[in-house]
Amino acid sequence: MKATFQVPSITCNHCVDKIEKFVGEIEGVSFIDVSVEKKSVVVEFDAPATQDLIKEALLDAGQEVV
């Protein structure tokens, strides 16, 4: 499964690193693409990962998800 999250609070590479760390810890996540320019995060994943778990990880990383 693939999901795109709009994350307007992404401003720098530190944000990218933190997002990759938090989302990458979720079992089932196979790909993460964070774009500072587009302020988006694209995640490819399989169970047990879910969109809700990914959104929670983004929030835990200090990001706003819309």
Swiss-Prot record:
Keyword Metal-binding included in the entry's annotation: yes
Documented effect of changing residue 13 to S: In strain: NCTC 11639
UniProt binding sites for Cu cation: 12, 15
Keywords: Copper, Disulfide bond, Metal-binding
Phenotype upon changing residue 3 to V: In strain: A68, NCTC 11638 and NCTC 11639
Database matches in PROSITE patterns: HMA_1 (PS01047), HMA_2 (PS50846)
Result, substituting residue 35 to N: In strain: NCTC 11639
Chain segments annotated as coiled-coil in the UniProt record: none
All residue ranges annotated as the HMA domain in the record: 1-66
Disulfide bonds: 12-15
GO terms for biological process, alphabetical: copper ion transport
InterPro entries in the record: Cu-bd, Heavy-metal-associated_CS, HMA_Cu_ion-bd, HMA_dom, HMA_dom_sf
One Gene Ontology MF term: copper ion binding
Role of this protein: Part of a cation-transporting system which is associated with copper export out of the H.pylori cells.
Other observations noted: Copper (2+) binding can oxidyze the Cys residues at the metal-binding site, leading to the formation of a disulfide bond.
UniProt name for this protein: COP-associated protein
The organism of origin for this protein: Helicobacter pylori (strain ATCC 700392 / 26695) (Campylobacter pylori)
High-level lineage: Bacteria, Pseudomonadati, Campylobacterota, Epsilonproteobacteria, Campylobacterales
Gene behind the chain: copP
